[in-house]
Each structure stands twice: as C-alpha cells, then as structure tokens.
C-alpha cells in the first residue's frame, strides 16, 4: 500500500467551481487542498514548474481526472463543485492508486484462524456496543471466506484494535473530527494488521455521527489484505457514507471477489470464487532467506541497518537482531520504490536516497522539504544518469559513490567532490568487480553487495577477506 496507513486530509472551505484554466491560481486554498489530496491519495509528484501551467495536459489536470475516474465523477479535470465536495468528505486515507484490488504483493494471513484484541474503548459508546460492532464487522468477512476470528483479552493479537487522537506512535497522526476516520495496516507481523480509530470522531451505531460498524468493516478489509475499490457500492470504496445497519448489510460482489482472490470461498458461501487466472500478476513479496536474494540498496539509520528491496525494506538493529519487514511507503509515503542507492550522512542526521537522476533526504520518518534534488547538484558530470551504490565512511567524513566501473568521493564537510575523481573501482578496491548493487561500512570493513553475494573488504589490507551471502545479515 502503498501506506499503508491513513494519511491526514486537511479540511478547507468549499468553493462552487474552480476550473484550472485561469480561475485557480497558486496559493488558492482550493488548489492547496487539491494538491494535498492528490499527493496523499493519487501519488501526485509536485513539480513547481509544471503544476500551474494552464494546459489540459498539465500533471495536476491529469491527476484530477484520474481521481474523478476512480471516484465515479465526470472527468472534467477541473476543481468543480462535485469534485471539491468529494474531497471534503470523510474517507479512508489509504491511497486510491494501485493496479490491484489487493495491496501490492498481495499480503495475506498465512492461516485461517486470526485473533484480535480491542486494546481500549471510545467514550462515545458502551463497551459492549463496541465489542458487538467489531464482532459484526469481522462476521462480514467470515461469512464469505474460510477465515475465523476469536478475541483475546491480553497479549499480542494478530489484529490489535485501538482508539487514539493526534500523535499515537505510528507516524500517522490523526487530524481531528470529520476528516480521516481511521487507518489500518495490511497483514503481517508487528503493527501490520492493526486498526486505529480516530477518537476525535463521534462514534455511533446510527446513521448520524460516524457509524463504527461500517468503518470497522472497511478497515478490517485492509487488515485482511484488500485495497480500495472504485465501485461506489463496494464496502472498500474509500469515501465514507452510511448505507445500512449491520442486520441488513451485505458485501458487494466486488468485495466478495476481492477477498476470495486471497483466501477462497467459505464452506457455506454461495459466492463465486475468483479464478486464479483472472487476477493480474502481482509482484512477489521477497523472502529474506531466498538464496538468490539481492538488495537494491543498503544504509544505516541511527544505529540500525536498512536493506531495501523493491517496495520493501528490512530493518535490523544491534539491540534487536531479529529483522523487521516493512513497506517503504509505510514510513515514507512519498518515496519511490526500487531504489538505486542510499547512505546515512551522520553530520546532518539524515539518509540520502537515490533513484534515477534524483535524490531525497529523510530524517527519521520525514522527507525533508526542498526534495527531490538532481544528483548533478552534488557535482556529478552530465554523463552520470544514476548512482549504483553509495556509502559514508564516518571516520573520514567521506561518501563514496559507485557508478559502473568507477567511483567518486564526496567531502561531507566541504560539500564538494574531492579532486582526482572518478577513479577505477578495481584500482582502490582490488577484488571488487563492477557493477556494485549496494555498499555498507560497518566494523571497519566495507561490505560490497553484488547479486546474492557480498564481499567483505578490509581497507587497511586492501583485500577481500570473506565472501558471504547477501542475506546473512538477516539471520539466514
């Protein structure tokens, strides 16, 4: 997902109609809202030089049309009253873009019996009413799959359900009443599968306020692995609306086909199981102990080591050697996947992340303002189109950039490339063959990753001391 948790939606005044051709200018509140909405839910990449061109082909027009198509609006490409009205409605914050009805990689529970725990309660409803709403929301999915659910009262469940306000420890703070209602994570270990409700909402079991049963059933669909649907009748349609009470509620055929593509039909279900061949091919979730596993890039981050692969990364720390597995978008929603290179710049407490001719700076879970920037701002010649690997040597305060069979050295103190570079990799790192996938500097050694192998290089002896599997860092 692509986050896979909900991102905040800012609420701004509605205006009747704001076509892009002349009526909306940069800084107009409706344009600001539209830009924020498209960035969060439609993967819109801000480009100051292009956003406000008054042409039908401008990126913002195309993204507005994409949003209008997905949400079932007339594709005007303009911020008309219907579009603005929908942007202001409460909704789920999982992005709407995506090629499939399930999350990328099709994460799902690898078992049929799933536990859940209600960690705390909203003051808006009696505890037994909350218990009943959650139970009925799970029953919706249980009726059409082989899945069963049971509640536990202590310890860690597969799905941890809680109510919170504002900052609540997962990088996605809630935004107050009437906007983002809740968020959920796809199946997996740790916080994956969990559901968080914004307790600033007025939770009810009625058409007024925000109906807990309907929101819970939607979010639990995410917890089971479903993405958003563009069908308005679907429970997984992203915009909130009250439809009916639990007693009269039935999943749409779109919801049934989506969940059964992951788990199959339940023994008593009359619904049609989606044939495997009808589902578009999906990228595989990488297995950390696959003997052929390679990494896109590797970096340290505040005492941890991050291993990036496709849209995922493993996170290993000295105090917790068991690697954690995450989606890149769960921590940095605006970063691309399939990264080229990454390294930690200790002097700025940031990690620089490279893809193609651009790079981003992240500090903690925040992408820094003013990025992405072009790699040529670092001093590379125009002939360099991308970086293969990068690593920071803390003792010398130098960063090494590897491109093809050459490498550059960057002075992090003076912020310039050192003179005399590029140099041949094999001249200064004997035994290291180009092209390098990733480099890590730990324990006084350089670790060069190439395919499924890594080469431990001693810079003092100028020799390769060990050849290991790339995933040996992941306890494989």
Curated annotation (Swiss-Prot):
GO terms for molecular function: metalloendopeptidase activity; zinc ion binding. Binds 2 Zn(2+) ions per subunit. Zn(2+) binds at residue 92. InterPro entries: Hemopexin-like_dom (IPR000585), Hemopexin-like_dom_sf (IPR036375), Hemopexin-like_repeat (IPR018487), Hemopexin_CS (IPR018486), M10A_MMP (IPR033739), MetalloPept_cat_dom_sf (IPR024079), Pept_M10_metallopeptidase (IPR001818), Pept_M10A (IPR021190). SUPFAM superfamilies: Hemopexin-like domain (SSF50923), Metalloproteases ('zincins'), catalytic domain (SSF55486), PGBD-like (SSF47090). Expressed in small intestine. Weak levels in heart and lung. One of its GO terms (cellular component) is extracellular region. Its cofactor is Zn(2+); Ca(2+). Pfam families: Hemopexin, Peptidase_M10, PG_binding_1. Zn(2+) 2 binds at residues 218, 222, 228. It is found in: Secreted, Extracellular space, Extracellular matrix. Can degrade fibronectin, gelatins of type I, III, IV, and V; weakly collagens III, IV, and V. Activates procollagenase. Belongs to the peptidase M10A family. This is Stromelysin-2. It comes from Mus musculus (Mouse).
């Amino acid at each position: 997902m692509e986050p896979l948790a909900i991102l905040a939606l800012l609420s701004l005044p509605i205006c009747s109609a704001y076509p892009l051709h002349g009526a909306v200018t940069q800084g107009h509140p409706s344009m600001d809202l539209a830009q924020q909405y498209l960035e969060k839910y439609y993967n819109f990449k801000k480009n100051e030089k292009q956003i406000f061109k008054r042409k039908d082909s401008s990126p913002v027009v195309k993204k507005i049309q994409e949003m209008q198509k997905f949400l079932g609006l007339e594709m005007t490409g303009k911020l008309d009253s219907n579009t603005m009205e929908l942007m202001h409605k409460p909704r789920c914050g999982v992005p709407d873009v995506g090629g499939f009805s399930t999350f990328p990689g099709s994460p799902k529970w690898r078992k049929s019996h799933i536990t859940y725990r209600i960690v705390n309660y909203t003051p808006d409803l009696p505890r037994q009413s909350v218990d009943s709403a959650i139970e009925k929301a799970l029953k919706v999915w249980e009726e059409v799959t082989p899945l069963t659910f049971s509640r536990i009262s202590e310890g860690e469940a597969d799905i941890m359900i809680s109510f919170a306000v504002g900052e609540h420890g997962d990088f996605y703070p809630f935004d107050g009443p009437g906007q983002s209602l809740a968020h959920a994570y796809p199946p997996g270990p740790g916080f994956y599968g969990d559901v968080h409700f914004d307790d600033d909402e007025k939770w009810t079991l009625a058409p007024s306020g925000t109906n807990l049963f309907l929101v819970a059933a939607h979010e639990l669909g995410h917890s089971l692995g479903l993405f958003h649907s563009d069908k308005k009748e679907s429970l997984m349609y992203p915009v909130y609306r009250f439809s009916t009470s639990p007693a009269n509620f039935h999943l749409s055929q779109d919801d049934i086909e989506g969940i059964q593509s992951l788990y199959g039909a339940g023994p008593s279900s009359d619904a049609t199981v989606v044939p495997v061949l009808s589902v578009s091919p999906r990228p595989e979730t990488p297995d950390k102990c696959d003997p052929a596993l390679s990494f896109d890039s590797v970096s340290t981050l505040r005492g941890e080591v991050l291993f990036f692969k496709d849209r995922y990364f493993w996170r290993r720390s000295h105090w917790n050697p068991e690697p954690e597995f995450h989606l890149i978008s769960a921590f940095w929603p605006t970063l691309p996947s399939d990264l080229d290179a990454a390294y930690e710049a200790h002097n700025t407490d940031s990690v620089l992340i490279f893809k193609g001719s651009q790079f981003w700076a992240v500090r903690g879970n925040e992408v820094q303002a003013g990025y992405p920037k072009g790699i040529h701002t670092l001093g590379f010649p125009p002939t360099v189109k991308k970086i293969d690997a990068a690593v920071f040597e803390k003792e010398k305060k130098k960063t090494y950039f590897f491109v093809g069979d050459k490498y550059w050295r960057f002075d992090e103190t003076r912020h310039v490339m050192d003179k005399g570079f590029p140099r041949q990799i094999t001249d200064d790192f004997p035994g290291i063959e180009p092209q390098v996938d990733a480099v890590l500097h730990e324990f006084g050694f350089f670790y060069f990753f190439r395919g499924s192998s890594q080469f431990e290089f001693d810079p003092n002896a100028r020799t390769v001391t060990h050849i290991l599997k790339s995933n040996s860092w992941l306890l494989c």
